[in-house]
Amino acid sequence: MALSREVFYFGFALFFIVVELPSGSWAGLEYSQSFPGGEIAVCETCRLGRGKCRRTCIESEKIAGWCKLNFFCCRERI
């Protein structure tokens, strides 16, 4: 009885692995957005090292752009 249960669980797990395999592409790469432009792109100020990516900017900083979802590119006020 235990052997048939093990075979069932193995087949069950194998089924979900096969279902999750992409059809002819790398997993998720067709949906990812690359860096120049897009939701996960870092703004130019932060990319050049003039700012920092944070959830909220501190009082002495201003928002210079977006780093990724829910993150601002914060730069010192002049």
From Swiss-Prot:
Disulfide bridge positions per record: 46-73, 53-67, 57-74
Function: Has antibacterial activity.
Organism, scientific name: Mus musculus
Stored Pfam families: Defensin_beta_2 (PF13841)
Signal peptide region: 1-27
Keyword vocabulary terms for this entry: Antibiotic, Antimicrobial, Defensin, Disulfide bond, Secreted, Signal
Record-given protein name: Beta-defensin 12
Family under the similarity heading: Belongs to the beta-defensin family.
GO BP term, example: defense response to Gram-negative bacterium
Subcellular location: Secreted
Record keyword DNA repair present: no
Keyword Signal in annotation: yes
Domain of life: Eukaryota
GO cellular component entries: extracellular region
Tissue: Only expressed in epididymis (caput, corpus and cauda).
